[in-house]
Amino acid sequence: MAVAALLVAGCSSAPQTGTQAKQDLRDSAKVKASAYEGAMIYYSLPSPLEVAYIVENSGISYEPNVLHKTELGVRYSTTKSQAINLGIYGSDLSYSILFNQQQVALKYLDCIKELSSGLDVSDTTSVKKLREMEDNIHDKEKLKKIVAQTFFHSDALLKENSRRPTAIMIVAGMWIESLYIATELSGGDPTTNPSLTRCIVEQGLVFDDLLGMLSSVSGNDDIAYIKSKIEVIGKDYDNIKSALGGSFVFTSENVTVDAAAYKRICDDIKAVRTEFTQLF
């Protein structure tokens, strides 16, 4: 289907311990492997729906101002801008669905359909599922099920050499938008909402997976561009990881993060997201 799979996130819901905690986290994230030019690429990238669940359960109210403007969708004309922003709109769709914003969700569906068509990543299954979402727009539970199961089945595209770069760009857009929503709602302060902070920090577990996917594609300027932009976020995660004792696996529910380091990664996520949304 069109591409941007709702891959289950590396945001755990309860504290665990040691090696088993990490294994359980990876298992729950449904870590997959796909062959690409002889290399095994492991990925457990964040699901927009999963991050939206964290936001929904954190007690924070719906904040439409953090979402990308739907009216800008028609302005994206290059493969890079269309793919990245298709992923961004996919995350915004999930967020809108969980907060019962049906009319907003419909607008994001329209953007997704338009960009999918422009990228030639739609197929019969994807069109059917998008139509099913429209038909069930007022049924939150049904929508959640549809999105979680079949929003964009990226597996086939990630294994298809000709469209793999496009699929990876969409996944990167989804990843950055999910983190952007969470960091914006936290206000750049790690003490605002412990569950959001933990979710954001735990994405350090999967950053290398995304970087590995990007690195698996050579000779593609669009992929190289995305890689160069997100590497600053990787450095932020390295700094946070070092301060936390060298691990993103926690034995307590709350995570104590240096305020300056947390603010820095929030600012860098925002900067990357802003640039991605302005690729006209």
Give the residues covered by each predicted segment.
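A cross-kingdom marker for long, charged
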Residues: 12, 213-280
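Bacterial lipoprotein signal-peptidase II cleavage site
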Residues: 12-19
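N-terminal Sec/ER secretory leader and immediately downstream segment
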Residues: 20-132
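Long, amphipathic, charge-rich alpha-helical segments that form helical bundles/coiled-coils
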Residues: 68-76, 80-92, 112-133, 137-140, ...
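Non-transmembrane, amphipathic alpha-helical segments
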Residues: 74, 78-81, 93-100, 104, ...
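Secondary-structure edge/capping motif, primarily at the C-terminal ends of alpha-helices
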Residues: 93-100, 119, 157-161, 182-190, ...
